[in-house]
Curated annotation (Swiss-Prot):
Gene source species: Bordetella avium (strain 197N)
Source taxonomy: Bacteria, Pseudomonadati, Pseudomonadota, Betaproteobacteria, Burkholderiales
EC class name: lyase
An example molecular function term from Gene Ontology annotations: phosphatidylserine decarboxylase activity
An example Gene Ontology CC term for this record: plasma membrane
Bilayer topology term: Peripheral membrane protein
Protein name (Swiss-Prot/TrEMBL): Phosphatidylserine decarboxylase proenzyme
Length: 294
C-alpha cells in the first residue's frame, strides 16, 4: 500500500464524518450563483460529466449543486429491458460485487465480508427471508446518474434508517475497512414483489449530504438510533418496475437483495463491470406465475 493510500485511510478513521458531510451539504445547497457555478464547473471538468443525456443540458442552469448532482435524464436516455420479467439494474454504476449470501454473510472484497443482519439494522426477523439468497452491490461514481430506480415492481413494506459512520466508498476502503457497508449510515427499503421479498439499501458515504426517497422525502432522523417505518395495506405504496424510488445527494452505493432461489444472474454480470439503470441485472429463477407474491 502506498504512503498516499495510508494517509487517506488514516484520515478516514480520524475525520469527523458527519460534521464534514453537514458542511458539504450546506455548500451543495447554496444558491449563491458564483459559488454554485464554480462548484458545478469544477465538478464537470474533473469527472468529465456527460451532460448530453440530462433533461437540462446546461450545468449552470441548475439552482444549486445538489440539483445538478441529482439531475433528471431525458425520457429515452435509459430504456428498460423489454422483457418485463427480468430484474433491472437500479442505478448507473459499477458492479462491485454480486453473488450468494452464505451463512448470513455478504462478500465485500477479498478477505472481507459483512453481516446480513447488521446490514438490515440488526433485526434477525427482517434478515431471515434473505438468508441463502443473492445480492448485488452497485457503486455509483461521482460522474454517474444518481437516482435509484425499482429493479422490479414492488409494494413497500418497511423503510429503516440505520445510523452509522460515513467512510468513503471506493475500492481502497472496500478492501481495507471491515464491515464497510454495515457500518456506514444507510436506508433500507423492503418491498413485497412477485419474486418474494426484495431489499434495496442506499448506503451513504463521506460528504453524502442526504438520501431521499420518493415517498418520504429527505431521510434525516435526529436521533442516533435505528428507526423503522412500516407501511400497511390501507394506503399501499406501489412502485412500478423502472420507477424512481430514491436519490443520493453526493452518494454512494446501492445494494439489492433477493431471497433464495428467486433470481439468477443474467449472463453472470461482470464484477467491476459497468452497468446502467434499466439494463438486465438478473432473470427470474422460475416463471413468475410459479413464484408466489408475498
Amino acid at each position: 500500500m502506498s504512503i498516499k493510500d495510508q494517509i487517506f485511510l488514516a484520515s478516514q478513521h480520524l475525520a469527523p464524518h458527519h460534521l464534514v458531510s453537514r458542511g458539504m451539504g450546506l455548500l451543495a445547497d447554496s444558491r449563491i450563483p458564483a459559488l454554485k457555478n464554480a462548484m458545478i464547473s469544477r465538478f464537470v471538468q474533473r469527472y468529465n460529466v456527460d451532460m448530453s443525456e440530462a433533461l437540462v443540458e446546461d450545468p449552470l442552469a441548475y439552482p444549486c449543486f445538489n440539483d445538478f448532482f441529482t439531475r433528471a435524464l431525458k425520457p429515452d436516455a435509459r430504456p428498460l429491458d423489454d422483457d418485463s420479467a427480468n430484474v433491472l439494474s437500479p442505478a448507473d454504476g459499477t458492479i462491485s460485487q454480486l453473488g450468494p449470501i452464505r451463512e448470513g454473510r455478504i462478500f465485500q472484497a477479498k478477505g472481507h465480508s459483512f453481516g446480513l443482519t447488521a446490514l438490515l439494522g440488526g433485526d434477525a426477523e427482517r434478515a431471515a427471508p434473505f438468508e441463502g439468497g443473492d445480492f448485488a452491490t452497485i457503486y455509483l461514481s461521482p460522474r454517474d446518474y444518481h437516482r435509484v430506480h425499482m429493479p422490479v415492481t414492488g409494494t413497500l413494506r418497511e423503510m429503516v434508517h440505520v445510523p452509522g459512520r460515513l467512510f468513503s466508498v471506493n475500492p481502497l476502503t472496500a478492501n481495507t475497512v471491515p464491515d464497510l457497508f454495515a457500518r456506514n449510515e444507510r436506508v433500507v427499503c423492503i418491498f413485497d414483489t412477485a419474486y418474494g421479498p426484495m431489499a434495496v439499501i442506499l448506503v451513504g458515504a463521506m460528504i453524502v449530504a442526504s438520501v431521499e426517497t420518493v415517498w418520504a422525502g429527505l431521510v434525516t432522523p435526529h436521533k442516533r438510533e435505528v428507526r423503522s417505518t412500516r407501511y400497511g395495506p390501507q394506503e399501499p405504496i406501489v412502485l412500478e418496475r423502472g420507477a424512481e424510488m430514491g436519490r443520493f445527494k453526493l452518494g454512494s452505493t446501492a445494494i439489492v437483495l433477493f431471497g433464495p432461489g428467486r433470481i439468477r444472474w443474467f449472463d453472470t454480470p461482470s464484477v467491476r463491470g459497468p452497468i446502467r439503470m434499466g439494463e438486465t441485472l438478473a432473470l427470474p429463477a422460475n416463471h413468475l406465475e410459479d413464484v408466489p407474491a408475498v
